[in-house]
Amino acid sequence: MDLYEYQARDLFEKHGVPVLRGIVAETPEQASEAAAKLGTPVVAVKAQVKVGGRGKAGGVKIAKSAAEAAERAEAILGMDIKGHTVHKVMVAEGADIAEEYYFSILLDRGERRYLAMCSREGGMDIETLAKERPEALAKVPVDPIDGVDDAKAREILSEAGFPDSEQDAIVPAVLKLWETYRDEDATLVEVNPMIKTGDGRILAIDGKMTVDNNASFRQPDHAGLVDRATTDPLELRAGELGLNYVKLDGNVGVIGNGAGLVMSTLDCVAYAGENFPGSPAPANFLDIGGGASAEIMANGLDLIMSDEQVRSVFVNVFGGITACDQVALGIKGALEKLGDKAVKPLVVRLDGNAVAEGRKILEEFNYPLVTMVSTMDEAASKAAELASKEA
């Protein structure tokens, strides 16, 4: 889960990373009050969106009074930045910037380890720096067990070209950023820029964080980081049900077991949809996972059926750990529960473990909206056809 800047700032502060004061505002009036409360000659009014490039888009503005902060907030709130609407701003105190650095720790999935990146040239787009001047960006592997101690922090800074005389001031911030990364089960902690002020202080003034949703069982506080106001209601409900669900823009609901199979199913539906009026496309990604019970299947189908955008549903299950009879029981249970509310046609393709039992359950159930299809391509085509008729 990507966090907003203000959320990252709060977690940094929690772990002792030196940060500037910042107050979140949702209206120009609140921004004015925040600027007055901070009481600094200059404040930055910063759009809170989970995407880069907000500065170039006009999403970061300087204000020199409370009234000016309100004007800046009014201009920023409601902006569209790369498809993200700005609903909040953070009013942050200004800083006397002498130097700007870059620092991050991330999960390097390819190498199966952590990676620390550091540069003396912060404040600019890091992708551009890495492409145009790769020698200016140090990349140092971090062992997940050993982590970052004083010696490792100095190694990272040395690789980035910081002389020994400058490292003493920066090492404490690096250690606290590592602590944040480790203790919050993050997959990314990034500060750009980390600054040195005119009086020699080191501050993290713009941070990004991504936390691992798979660690939510030991990070109960992370539930409070979910922005319910901007998250799709179906995704919120799916999370409460423990379902791996992503909302898409099409009208064919998709349910499968295993991320690979579901992604292949999305492709099949999109390809098949090109042959029908309106070009039906996938409405969602929903992986019920391995060993799914009838209850999980029923919850998934109930969720998809509640999506007003969905015109047909394609259930594609290859039984391994997941038994096809449990899937069939889940379909039956969901349709019985929905009763007259179940008005969307289902195309079901079952294969593998307990397929005969699963097909028998659905055949005996004999529900008029359920169509059994034997192959994936035929099922995708049928689901797209039904969606085009229902549109």
From Swiss-Prot:
Pfam families: ATP-grasp_2 (PF08442), Ligase_CoA (PF00549). GO terms for biological process: succinyl-CoA metabolic process; tricarboxylic acid cycle. Gene3D superfamilies: ATP-grasp fold, A domain, ATP-grasp fold, B domain, Succinyl-CoA synthetase domains. Substrate binds at residues 257, 320-322. Its EC number is 6.2.1.5. Residues 9-237 form the ATP-grasp domain. It comes from the Bacteria. One of its GO terms (cellular component) is succinate-CoA ligase complex. GO terms for molecular function: ATP binding; magnesium ion binding; succinate-CoA ligase (ADP-forming) activity; succinate-CoA ligase (GDP-forming) activity. Keywords: ATP-binding, Ligase, Magnesium, Metal-binding, Nucleotide-binding, Tricarboxylic acid cycle. Its cofactor is Mg(2+). It catalyses: succinate + ATP + CoA = succinyl-CoA + ADP + phosphate; GTP + succinate + CoA = succinyl-CoA + GDP + phosphate. Binds 1 Mg(2+) ion per subunit. Pathway: Carbohydrate metabolism; tricarboxylic acid cycle; succinate from succinyl-CoA (ligase route): step 1/1. Disulfide bonds: none annotated. ATP binds at residues 46, 53-55, 95, 100. It is an enzyme of class 6 (ligase). InterPro entries: ATP-grasp, ATP-grasp_succ-CoA_synth-type, ATP_grasp_subdomain_1, Succ-CoA_synthase_bsu_CS, SUCC_ACL_C, Succ_CoA_ligase-like_bsu, Succinyl-CoA_synth-like. Mg(2+) binds at residues 192, 206. PANTHER family: SUCCINATE--COA LIGASE [GDP-FORMING] SUBUNIT BETA, MITOCHONDRIAL, SUCCINYL-COA SYNTHETASE BETA CHAIN. Heterotetramer of two alpha and two beta subunits. Succinyl-CoA synthetase functions in the citric acid cycle (TCA), coupling the hydrolysis of succinyl-CoA to the synthesis of either ATP or GTP and thus represents the only step of substrate-level phosphorylation in the TCA. The beta subunit provides nucleotide specificity of the enzyme and binds the substrate succinate, while the binding sites for coenzyme A and phosphate are found in the alpha subunit. Belongs to the succinate/malate CoA ligase beta subunit family. This is Succinate--CoA ligase [ADP-forming] subunit beta. It comes from Cutibacterium acnes (strain DSM 16379 / KPA171202) (Propionibacterium acnes). The lineage of its organism: Bacteria, Bacillati, Actinomycetota, Actinomycetes, Propionibacteriales.
